[in-house]
């Protein structure tokens, strides 16, 4: 998402690292607390998207409301507790549910984007089972210490390919090593 000096048709971001880290930590804490997560996540999406700029200088905005998806966010947060239960395979068994919730959030997010106040006719067309596969692969890849970065780079490419409703092709060009050195 960060525009390089040689790229002309990329999204650019004006988000500073300090506020981004602080807001990300706040989302993580509220994910743990469960109840505030719909409001904090929605606020984070609004804050971050407002700092994105399209190649022609248009400003993006996120218009989703917490009350649209509060139950999905809370259920997803509850699923996060599966790792604390002493059943090692429980997070993997919950993968179909967590993937379903994640897919609902992604579809909601994409459908609530605007550019310069105009609604964008975007939708996320990625199917459920591939999303489950990417979610499971992402979970398993964390055991490789560094392999997760390549998985998430490929996952982002898949997600971008599945955004429909624009004449412009959305492409993620990041690589695993670029993901890794930024974390």
What are these model-predicted stretches?
Residues 24-44, 81-100, 135-154:
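Hydrophobic, aromatic-rich membrane-embedded alpha-helical segments
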Residues 74-77, 139:
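Short, surface-exposed amphipathic charged segments that create phosphate/polyanion-binding patches used
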Residues 1-25, 40-75, 103-134, 153-182:
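Membrane-interface extramembranous regions at the lipid-water interface
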């Amino acid at each position: 998402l960060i525009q390089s000096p040689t790229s002309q048709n990329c999204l650019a971001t004006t988000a500073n690292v300090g506020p981004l880290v602080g807001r990300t930590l706040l989302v993580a804490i509220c994910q743990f607390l469960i109840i505030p997560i719909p409001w904090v996540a929605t606020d984070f999406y609004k804050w971050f998207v407002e700092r994105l700029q399209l190649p022609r200088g248009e400003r993006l905005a996120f218009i989703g409301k917490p009350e649209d998806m509060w139950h999905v966010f809370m259920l997803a947060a509850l699923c996060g507790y599966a790792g604390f239960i002493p059943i090692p395979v429980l997070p993997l068994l919950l993968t179909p549910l967590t993937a379903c919730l994640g897919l609902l959030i992604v579809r909601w997010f994409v459908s609530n984007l605007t550019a310069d106040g105009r609604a964008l006719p975007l939708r996320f067309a990625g199917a459920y089972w591939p999303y489950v596969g990417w979610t499971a692969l992402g979970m398993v890849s964390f055991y490789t210490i560094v392999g997760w970065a390549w998985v998430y780079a490929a996952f982002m490419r898949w997600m971008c390919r599945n955004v429909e409703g624009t004449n412009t092709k959305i492409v993620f060009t990041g690589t695993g090593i670029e993901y890794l050195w930024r974390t």
